[in-house]
A protein has these predicted regions:
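Alpha-helical assembly-interface signal, strongest on the long, hydrophobic N-terminal helix that forms
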Residues: 2-88
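Short, conserved structural patches
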Residues: 57, 64-180
Length: 180
């Protein structure tokens, strides 16, 4: 027969407080680590978006003031495209992950006519044409610069893979500038 003074394990266990701090710590720490990693990841993504925008803007501003003779604009365009030049404008970005599309266009009515293009033979997309139509008036010259950066996630690439293209973000900015 059982001793009635001993309440048994079923009633002793809930009353015991030994080890509760360790259990709470084990439950809270993974959540805190995920929150910290999420904050770092969001900061990195924000920086990539900001630097991609800066790159496109700087290229459009600088290229819009080249002289309009037959060789100077093309020569100037060729100096912007090497990885070293990209790295100087946006040092936080990896130059090998940057894709540039640059056009100098002359407007004829609402139709942009490409004068120079990088990469050679490229044609403006519908979004680029729409942007330049809003910025550059008839018989004026302007530039279109689109910078795209392929950013790989640091912490959550495996989790984000089903939602993103190969667990990477590709911010893209198009800037149009009236040629001075």
């Amino acid at each position: 027969m059982r001793d009635r003074s001993d309440p048994g394990p079923a009633t002793r266990f809930p009353a015991s407080r030994r080890g509760s701090a360790a259990i709470e710590f084990a439950a809270v720490v993974p959540i805190m680590i995920l929150l910290a990693a999420g904050i770092v990841e969001c900061g990195a993504v924000f920086q990539v978006y900001n630097q991609t925008n800066r790159l496109a803007t700087q290229y459009a501003i600088v290229w819009s003031d080249c002289r309009d003779d037959t060789t100077s604009c093309q020569t100037e365009l060729n100096t912007y495209t090497p990885d070293a030049a990209k790295g100087n404008v946006a040092p936080q970005l990896s130059p090998s992950r940057i894709t540039l599309q640059m056009f100098q266009v002359r407007m004829s009515g609402t139709t942009p006519q490409v004068v120079y293009a990088y990469p050679a033979g490229a044609t403006p997309t519908a979004a680029q044409i729409d942007a330049v139509q809003k910025t550059v008036p008839d018989r004026q010259t302007g530039v279109i610069v689109t910078a795209t950066y392929r950013h790989s996630l640091m912490f959550f690439s495996a989790l984000a893979a089903p939602f993103l293209d190969a667990a990477a973000l590709a911010p893209s900015y198009t800037v149009t500038q009236l040629k001075t």
